[in-house]
Amino acid sequence: MFPTPLTAFALASFMAVVASSVNGSGTINFGSSVEHLSVRVSGSSGRATFEDKAAGGNVNGQIDINCVNIAGNTATLSGLVTHSNKKSMIGQEGVFRIVDNGSKKATPDMASLINFHQPGTSTDCNAGEFDLTPVKGNFTIQ
């Protein structure tokens, strides 16, 4: 049998490995833009897909998430666009925020549109202001 201090240390170490996650999908309407977003993130990496229907045309693609900042029920995520039907977006950084307000029957979850920019020219998941709007869908932040 392990001495008590070693057992407590082992238990604390095991509990510290629990990774955060952000999962779900939803559609937001923001002005004339309708954006559908799906997210699957565990720890500090994962993928997000987007479909944006706007007056300027339809754009879709995938973001490889490499930065995740979770504070309570709010997650700010960023990463690089790796696929898109608009080739000029590939290599750009996308950053967005999601707020998990509980189950679908509770207050709707919130999300921002994805803000795209050249890497290093604006904020990543560690900063930024976001206009949030209600989501038709459900996101889970753990």
Task: State the predicted function of each range.
Residues 1-19:
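Sec-dependent, cleavable N-terminal signal peptides
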Residues 106-142:
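C-terminal partner/receptor-binding element of secreted or periplasmic proteins
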Residues 24, 53, 65, 101-102, ...:
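Short linear motifs in intrinsically disordered/low-complexity regions
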Residues 30-98:
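Predominantly extracellular/secreted and cell-surface proteins with exposed
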Residues 20-22, 42, 75, 98, ...:
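Compositionally biased, low-complexity repeat tracts
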Residues 85-89, 95-117:
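Extended soluble regions of mature proteins
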Residues 17-27:
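Boundary/junction segments of secreted and surface-exposed precursor proteins
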